[in-house]
Regions:
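Predominantly a Rossmann-like dinucleotide-binding segment in NAD(P)-dependent oxidoreductases
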Residues: 3-74, 81
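C-terminal helix-rich "cap/oligomerization" subdomain common to oxidoreductases
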Residues: 96, 162-197
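A general structural signal for well-ordered alpha-helical segments in protein cores
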Residues: 3, 7, 58-59, 88, ...
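Short, flexible active-site-adjacent loop segments at beta-strand->alpha-helix junctions, enriched
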Residues: 1, 28-33, 107, 121, ...
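Active-site loop of classical SDR/Rossmann-like NAD(P)-dependent oxidoreductases
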Residues: 150-161, 177
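A structural signal for the main folded, soluble domain(s) of proteins
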Residues: 137-141
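A short glycine-threonine-serine/GTX helix/turn-capping micro-motif
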Residues: 46-52, 145-154
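Contiguous beta-strand/loop segments that form the cofactor/metal-binding neighborhood of enzyme cores
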Residues: 60-133, 150, 161-169
């Protein structure tokens, strides 16, 4: 999600303070894992579970919006299945600036992949934050604005282009999605999972 054109626009809107100070963010992502997919997605030896499989998208979205690591993470609900992995969790995150966030991820239920950012002057709604091509910007005193940034093919091309750009320039890491981002998200997911044991 980090390299999609819509996220360039989103970052710009947030940096300009169009919706004011961010107060709350919510995102959800869920589907029913079936068939051969179910084995991998539930198997602890293969990194199974909703948090590792799709929660990374939610937590990545929150990092894009806040630019920070949460100060506190509280699991409001988690369901550990018979395989020993999570098939559902609801997390509440709190950041140093007082912003709060809610992240819901499940591989046992269909959920729309939507997200909302609430600010002091308005809000932004993404009907599908993972395959993000559309967002609706609502600013106090103005008509809602639909912003569209369609992808060229399927969205993965932007990740490929960024890798190609970095290799050509001799970079070891992207400045869009840094090693620091990757380590922070991995540590966050590890800490969340450890809190469930």
């Amino acid at each position: 999600i980090w390299f999609l054109p819509l996220y360039d626009r989103l970052r710009s809107i947030l940096q300009q303070g169009v919706i004011g100070e961010i107060k709350h963010i919510s995102c959800q992502y869920g589907f029913v894992a079936t068939g051969a997919r179910k084995e991998r997605k539930f198997n602890p030896a293969l990194g199974g579970g909703a948090l590792l499989d799709i929660g990374i998208y939610n937590l990545g979205f929150l990092r894009i919006v806040t630019g920070n690591e949460p100060q506190n993470v509280e699991t409001q609900k988690v369901h550990i299945n018979e395989y020993g992995t999570d098939d559902y969790s609801c997390l509440k995150l709190t950041y140093n600036d007082g912003c709060t966030a809610e992240s819901v991820q499940t591989i046992g239920q269909e959920l729309k992949r939507n997200a909302r950012i609430e600010g002091t002057k308005g809000s932004i709604f993404l009907p599908d934050f993972q395959h993000a091509e559309t967002m609706i910007l609502e600013v106090e005193g103005k008509e809602p604005e639909t912003i569209e940034c369609p992808v060229d093919i399927n969205g993965f091309e932007y990740e490929i282009r960024e890798v190609s750009r970095c290799v050509k320039l001799g970079y070891c890491s992207s400045d869009v999605y840094t090693a620091k981002d990757s380590i922070a998200l991995t540590r966050l997911m590890y800490d969340i999972r450890m809190s469930w044991s």
